[in-house]
């Protein structure tokens, strides 16, 4: 009898352990890449059975005339927010691999005098110096033969230990470039990089991978593509059919890829599709926020072919745009340490509201470090100190590199732009209702904060949703690093980001756009309230 009770007790214990193990196994399985095909059948079918995924706030009623709790009718009944039908999702862009090509661009030139000069940063010799006779044409028919451009060099003498004089050659740098080869930009020259004296040009350029999650920041994405398109070798862009809050959204970026909107950069874009929402993401928004970057990194890197360990990986938010010169330096030089960050100019609602300080977020390292130290997890790169990771010592011993975190730029020398909430009022509205449920207070839950007239008032004054009024003055459009060059050259399209559309035009004495010359003149400013695009 006792033996029978003992066996019955053991059976109940084993059944309980099996049930607990199954629950933990399923929860762990949902975070791995390979079961996403299974999860795509219904992202919340099984998870809603074990975990309560009910939203903290009531959902809007989809029926006409029903109560719209915490949502306005523009959002609740908009057909743009319904998932795409299967017929439009037939093209499997998210399964296509991208082969990284070799960069064959000749960035440096070797002179006869022994100098190695960075072409864009070195002053060219257009005329022979005084005292040198003009070169005679060597063409057979009297036409001058084409010769490669000449670069100015400066020769110096250094006294050796035994009194012998040694000559070496340096390039003559253009403003904004530094170093013996004129390839070190100002954002590196004035950074806290501890190994500046060890910087040397590479024989073969690295490839640069830029990873981004996108929701509806398509104008800023277009600016990124134009700003970095010639130095970045692969843009890994992740899009989900869920917002960060867990509600359905259309695959707008995939549509823009297929209809030719981004045809000029299509060959460099690797499309990543996140077709499920992580369990627990509705209750804790940071789970969803972190998982987006984890999935982006793991799925994206796994589909890059011809990848080398010393290639550069940079992960950004959609509103963070690194400066081209800094990214090009990482591509062309050896001797810098890792991981690295960018000091970015901070703006709110548009580049016209410049916030004090800089945004400094660790966002890049080599592919080797990403795999060995961070375990191919982009959120660890952005939020975890490398010395807290268990494998960083093994990585140092294997590579012989001492890991020292540094930042491109400084508080006085911006190495990029961070434009927060930089949308039209309608775009800010969509950001409010799409925001994850973890960064409290969640302003999208308040009906008055979603009012478009209220949002226009925030853009006009630079205020915040909590009612505070900032004291910083509007930025001067003539300042260096005011905005990316592509924006400045296309004022008519991006004027809502460059000039406050709800303020009176600045006078010429205030240094407004009339001082910018042909690069960015404003159009007629008759109706300020109709300035959205």
Curated annotation (Swiss-Prot):
UniProt-annotated glycosylation sites, renumbered to this chain: 141, 241, 259, 397
Subcellular location as annotated: Golgi apparatus membrane
Residue ranges that the UniProt entry lists as topological domain Lumenal: 24-533
GO cellular component terms attached to this protein's record: Golgi membrane; membrane
Transmembrane segments: 8-23
UniProt-listed Enzyme Commission number(s): 2.4.1.144
A single GO molecular function term of this UniProt record: glycosyltransferase activity
Pathway this chain belongs to: Protein modification; protein glycosylation
UniProt-listed Pfam families: Glyco_transf_17 (PF04724)
Domain of life: Eukaryota
Main location group: Golgi
InterPro entries associated with the record: Glyco_trans_17
Record keywords: Glycoprotein, Glycosyltransferase, Golgi apparatus, Membrane, Signal-anchor, Transferase, Transmembrane, Transmembrane helix
Region (Disordered): 119-158, 507-533
Top-rank EC class of the record's enzyme: transferase
Any GO BP: N-acetylglucosamine metabolic process
Catalytic function, reaction form: N(4)-{beta-D-GlcNAc-(1->2)-alpha-D-Man-(1->3)-[beta-D-GlcNAc-(1->2)-alpha-D-Man-(1->6)]-beta-D-Man-(1->4)-beta-D-GlcNAc-(1->4)-beta-D-GlcNAc}-L-asparaginyl-[protein] + UDP-N-acetyl-alpha-D-glucosamine = N(4)-{beta-D-GlcNAc-(1->2)-alpha-D-Man-(1->3)-[beta-D-GlcNAc-(1->4)]-[beta-D-GlcNAc-(1->2)-alpha-D-Man-(1->6)]-beta-D-Man-(1->4)-beta-D-GlcNAc-(1->4)-beta-D-GlcNAc}-L-asparaginyl-[protein] + UDP + H(+)
Cytoplasmic side: 1-7
Family: Belongs to the glycosyltransferase 17 family.
Subunit annotation: Interacts with MGAT4D.
Protein name: Beta-1,4-mannosyl-glycoprotein 4-beta-N-acetylglucosaminyltransferase
Source organism: Homo sapiens
């Amino acid at each position: 009898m006792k033996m029978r009770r003992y066996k019955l007790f053991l059976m109940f214990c084993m059944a309980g352990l099996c049930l607990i193990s199954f629950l933990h196994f399923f929860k762990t399985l949902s975070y791995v890449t390979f079961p996403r095909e299974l999860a795509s059948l219904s992202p919340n079918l099984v998870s809603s059975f074990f975990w309560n995924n009910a939203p903290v706030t009531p959902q809007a009623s989809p029926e006409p005339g029903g109560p719209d709790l915490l949502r306005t009718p523009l959002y609740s009944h908009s057909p743009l927010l319904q998932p795409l039908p299967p017929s439009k999702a037939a093209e499997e862009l998210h399964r296509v691999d991208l082969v990284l090509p070799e960069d064959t661009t000749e960035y440096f030139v070797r002179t006869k005098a022994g100098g190695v000069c960075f072409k864009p940063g070195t002053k060219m010799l257009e005329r022979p110096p005084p005292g040198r006779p003009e070169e005679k044409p060597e063409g057979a028919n009297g036409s001058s033969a084409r010769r490669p451009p000449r670069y100015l060099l400066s020769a110096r003498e250094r006294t050796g230990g035994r009194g012998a004089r040694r000559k070496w050659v340096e390039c003559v740098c253009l403003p904004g470039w530094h170093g013996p080869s004129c390839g070190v930009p100002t954002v590196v020259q004035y950074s806290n990089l501890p190994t500046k004296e060890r910087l040397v040009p590479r024989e073969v350029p690295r490839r640069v991978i830029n990873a981004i999650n996108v929701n509806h920041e398509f104008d800023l994405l277009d600016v990124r593509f134009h700003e970095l398109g010639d130095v970045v070798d692969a843009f890994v862009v992740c899009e989900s059919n869920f917002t960060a809050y867990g509600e359905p959204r259309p695959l707008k970026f995939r549509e823009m890829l297929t209809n030719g909107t981004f045809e000029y950069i299509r060959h460099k874009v690797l499309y990543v599709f996140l077709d499920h929402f992580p369990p627990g993401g509705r209750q804790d928004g940071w789970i969803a926020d972190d998982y987006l970057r984890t999935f982006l990194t793991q799925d994206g890197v796994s589909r890059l072919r011809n990848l080398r360990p010393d290639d550069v990986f940079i992960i950004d938010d959609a509103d963070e745009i690194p400066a081209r010169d800094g990214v090009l330096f990482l591509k062309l030089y050896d001797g810098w340490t890792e991981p690295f960050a960018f000091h970015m100019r901070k703006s709110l609602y548009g580049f016209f509201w410049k916030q004090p300080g800089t945004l400094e977020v660790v966002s890049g390292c080599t592919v080797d470090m990403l795999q060995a130290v961070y375990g191919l997890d982009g959120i660890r790169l952005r939020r975890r100190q490398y010395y807290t990771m268990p494998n960083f010592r093994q990585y140092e011993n294997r590579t012989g590199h001492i890991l020292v975190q540094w930042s491109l730029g400084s508080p006085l020398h911006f190495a990029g732009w961070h434009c927060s909430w930089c949308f039209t009022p309608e775009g800010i509205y969509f950001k409010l209702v799409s925001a994850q449920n973890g960064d409290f207070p969640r302003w999208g839950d308040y009906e008055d904060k979603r009012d478009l007239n209220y949002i226009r008032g925030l853009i006009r004054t630079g205020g915040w949703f909590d009612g505070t009024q900032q004291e910083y003055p509007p930025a001067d459009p003539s300042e260096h690093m005011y905005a990316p060059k592509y924006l400045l050259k296309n004022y008519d399209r991006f004027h809502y980001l460059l000039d406050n559309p709800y303020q009176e035009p600045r006078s010429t004495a205030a240094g407004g756009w009339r001082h910018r010359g042909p690069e960015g003149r404003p159009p007629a400013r008759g109706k300020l309230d109709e300035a959205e695009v």
